[in-house]
UniProtKB/Swiss-Prot annotation:
InterPro entries membership: Sec16_CCD (IPR024340), Sec16_Sec23-bd (IPR024298)
Taxonomy of the source species: Eukaryota, Metazoa, Ecdysozoa, Nematoda, Chromadorea
Task performed by this protein: Plays a role in the organization of the endoplasmic reticulum exit sites (ERES), also known as transitional endoplasmic reticulum (tER). In association with tfg-1, accumulates at ERES to positively regulate secretory cargo trafficking from the endoplasmic reticulum to the endoplasmic reticulum-Golgi intermediate compartment (ERGIC) and Golgi apparatus.
Segments of this protein annotated with the region Disordered: 18-134, 172-193, 815-843, 866-942, 972-1069, 1140-1232
Name of the protein this chain belongs to: Protein transport protein sec-16A.1
Biased composition regions of type Polar residues, renumbered to the chain: 26-37, 78-100, 817-836, 1046-1060, 1149-1159, 1168-1178, 1222-1232
Gene null: resulting phenotype: RNAi-mediated knockdown abolishes localization of tfg-1 to endoplasmic reticulum exit sites (ERES).
Gene3D superfamilies per UniProt: 1.25.40.1030
Species this chain originates from: Caenorhabditis elegans
Pfam families in UniProt: Sec16, TPR_Sec16
Record's compositionally biased regions (Low complexity): 67-76, 896-914, 1194-1203
GO cellular component, one term: endoplasmic reticulum-Golgi intermediate compartment
Amino acid sequence: MRRYRIDSMKYEQRMNAGASGFDMSDWNNPYNASPPSSRGGDDDASSVNHSRPRRSRLDNDIPQPRRPILIQPARPVSQKSNRQGTGMSNGSRGLNSTFNGYDRTYSRYHQNSSRGPSEGFSGAPSARNASGYASDYANSRAGVGLLPNNHREPVRPRSTAAERYANASSMRNGFVYDSGESDKTSEELEEDEEEEEVRNFYMEGRAQGSRSVTNTLASEVYNSESESYYYGVVKLGSAIVDHVFRTMPPPEKYYKMPPIDRVAYVFYCAVNNKPYNNIDEFHVIFNREFYSYRGYGDSKDLALFKVCKRMQEEFSLKQLEADRLAYEKARQEAAESEKLDFNQHKIEEREEPKLNISQPEEVLSNGPLHYHSCLQFATIGVGGKLVIIKPAGTIDSITGHVLSTSSVHVDDLKTFLHFDEQSGKVIESVQNFKGPLIAGQTPTHSVRLYIQRQIDALRQIRNAGDVKKSEVVDALLVWQLLEIMVQQHGRVTGPDVATLLTNASEELGEKTGISSNGTSESGSKFEAKERFNKYLLGGHINEAVESAITDGLYADAMTLIRRLHPNDAKKIEEIEARFMNLRSIDDPFATLVAVSSDQPPPILTNSAFDDDNNWKRHAAIVLANLNSQTAMQTIYHLGLLLAKRERNCAADFCLLVVCILAGYDPFIPVAHDGDETSRKHIGLVHSGSNLLNRVDGLSGTAGFSFTDLHATDIFDYALRLGNNNVDSPLAKSIDYQLARIEYAKKLSSFGGFATDAFRYCTEVARSLWMYVAAFDKNAMFDLCDLAESLQYMAAATPDESGWITTMRGMLGAAPVQESQQHVPQPQPVENKSISSEAKKWHDEHQAPLEIGSRNDQQHNDKTVEKPIAPGRASLPPPTLVTESSSESTFTDKSDSSVTVAASASRTSTLTSSTLPPPPSLPKTIEKPISTPPPISKNVVPEMTPPAIVKPPMPTLSMPIPPVSTPIMVSPQPIPIPKPVDASIAKSPRSELDDLWDTSPPSNQTSYPPAPRNIQPSYSPAPNFANPTAPSVPTPPPAVSSAPVLQQATLGQASIPNAKTTAPPVPQKQPELALNERKASKGWFGSIKEKVIKSIPSANQMILPDDSKPSIVWDPVQKRYVGAGVEEEVVAAPPPVMSAPHLMGGGPDSNKSSTNSLRSARSGVGSRYLQSGMATSQAPAMDTGMPPMMPPTMPMSFSFMPAPTEDDSSEYVDPFSGEPTAPSESLSKQNND
């Protein structure tokens, strides 16, 4: 309800009976007042009991404006004193007359009075012996000290008992007093005096026991001048005060209160037009409010004014509420009257048949109508839909027309929530965040746009006075890390993170932390050290050394070279030890030296770490220069230390960096040591939501912050961008997955987001499918119920919603302990030593095997054993992503149990009853840092592959409908890409794979011709017929053994997939596998292979099938011999090989160029002619046979390498560039 202001001028005019211009000086104006008189003119004792005595008609001549009527009771004075020449009549006292022991001087009239000194109160001569109730009423006011000290008492007014009607000639307004003259003798006067004294004695007792207006209390307690002043403070006019004292005489306790309390009481009576019954309660309430304002520093005048103003406002609100209630009551009465008239009109129309109970007269016969017009009915349906029924006769809110027929409207609930500011903010945030984020489907630029909005919002509040700037910078670091991850598709390096930290540190203006202990450094020395640290922060080691030598910082340069590039230790150690004693432990250089020496940095235990910004430089200098285990451990423990100090954003930043660079999963809870309660894991990424809520007003309504969930979603999305949308560490995070389920519920309740909510349900089910046993069953059932209720609103196909029934069957089946489940691991056919070594390493480190895809598959055609899957309950739900240009997807209609075998290599450590402690790192350093975090074994930071998960296997009797599932290439682990891989350029062959890596779905199983990464990829589930579960498990089809393009590392050129040693004897492929492999290619696959072969590659040599070698190496002649081998034609240097003759001369033979050997003797490339330009109709590399070593060519190629010019016996290996001798096994094989 709106508040009303009180116009001071109108309020003053109304309260002062229309007299404007009232100010503080009016309180000093003289006044006269007339007491109330009885109706009959006689002294009636019963008039004392009247609650509201009437004013006399003689009061019309009172001048306006006047001050409040403050009347004192007349003191008992003998009549003799009146005859002592005082010039006063009517019982008035002298100048120094006393009453009750108190001196009181007065003057009868003031200079501006309307009456003369000899006139009565009404203008007629007054009688000196007048007495009665009116006299007591007036005398009681003077006795309580309500008149100022310098004010003279007025003449005691004439009472009703002394009133006499005068002659008509002397009448004024028809009512006058007698002249007051008496012709009595002196004896009679003395008798009257005695009677008057007795009468006054009894009247005093009567006044004390009767109405409180005649109480005689001490008058010297309070000064009436201050009371008059406070009347002016609250702008209370004299007429209003006069009215209050006449109509609502205050109680006895009123005169015991201070002047401020009495003024407030009179103001209350004037505003509410009624007295406050309980004066003690009023005193308590007033003092509570009064001293509350005083406590805030207000003066007495201002506090009194605020209390009185609040009284006026409360009274105005009560009046408005009463008016509203009266209006509503009148409106209801009018409506009832209209209904009765309407019903009476309808009842008279008897000719119309009335068969429906909804007719007005029938409703009237059953009861009164509650509404007189048609109302709209609404209900909330599934998916946040609002169904509204608008009957005929209602007014359309959009068009404004009256509806002639009833209509049904379906609308989203979110359209009605925009009127609520908080709900509008939530809906706006949901619309800006394009969730769920799916790698390959959600464009990266939309995600970056959302991140940029959060960064801009944080920059807006960075300079606010009530916000800690370091907290804003920490939150900015998290969002900037997410931005660079999305921009670089999940590939982030240590220098990238160091750049973010350096910029944030410079933004806060932090100093370097270098201090000199006992030595004074000049300005040039200080600038030299600053320049030296600047190079180190950028990761420029050589430039830092040169700068240090140039500026005379030899100790810095030698220490840096000693730690990063070991040199003459004896010479440098002496200088280093002497120089490091002068360095401060807060210097980032000291941290770098300590970490590079595998020692704990002093910053972790130094008190200077209390600085909110000091940690950024130390972390930046470590990440910019080191990628060792000790460096990752330092960042990990730095994050734990920040979490212990409740720097949540900074702590999460450090843990996320370790997750990206070292593969540690920070989302799994870690057991605490002893009584330690600090946080050691991440539930949802702290993104500064408490700061962002100040800008957008968005707060979590589901028990968590939506902004934090969005930040965690973006991190998961960025990780999946780098590993082809496969599992990430967040897949088994309970906090994250449950928060996504609650978020999906919120989306479904708003309406209009049914499709997004269903996609969230599907993605959640896909992520936790292998870890469903670790989650609460009730939460999983809620997920199924939500998805089932939204499947029709989201227009989901049966394949997209088939996982709901499967998951219900998994949850309803009897729980099987994970330790009792056995999933056969894929075992290679050969290379027993490598397999046993990998198994031993796996047992020690609890990580999946990675040997098959990187070693055995290069020259072994292995088959994967299919695990026994009685039902298809452990199949993941189909993906909703569409095919994109950044990755390729493949479909598989064959038995999808391959997915189970491939998924068996994922991590599953959540089903254990207790939280696992952080695993220890291998002992590779002599001085480890306290408790090392679980970091991967490799020195180069990369994601540690998750441990093997054993999915729950349902019982055989459980009927579960089959669900289409994407094909998994091989049961290899799911490593997150290394940061080093991001800097390697793709070869033309790999770029062609990106373009041609996807074939259209067919009725048969399709395999990728040359997978770039041995990682599973999901694809849209085609509408295949649901196959029946096989009664006998059959092995899955063998994976094609096409050569895998290996990426070079650290700037080295990629080499072909071959070795100089003799390859093992290939296994004979089963006939079924060969047929399936040939059929899987199809017409499109064969065309693609021909096009790929026709394009030469700079990093790879494609070798033909050499199962039947026709050219062998002759160790005696030191050259290849065989059919079609010709002598090399020696030409002018540089030697050029002659064009080889093609054997067979058939139409399928092609000639190759003879000028391709000009770079054969360069020492770094192959000395063999590349055969990529030649094509053949013979089966290519996808026949399932492993590549044979050394490379030989079929008979149709008639290829012979050119020998060197000299006759030296050295043999040049075409793949290594160094002279080697051919192996004996190879010669023996070729001779055979």
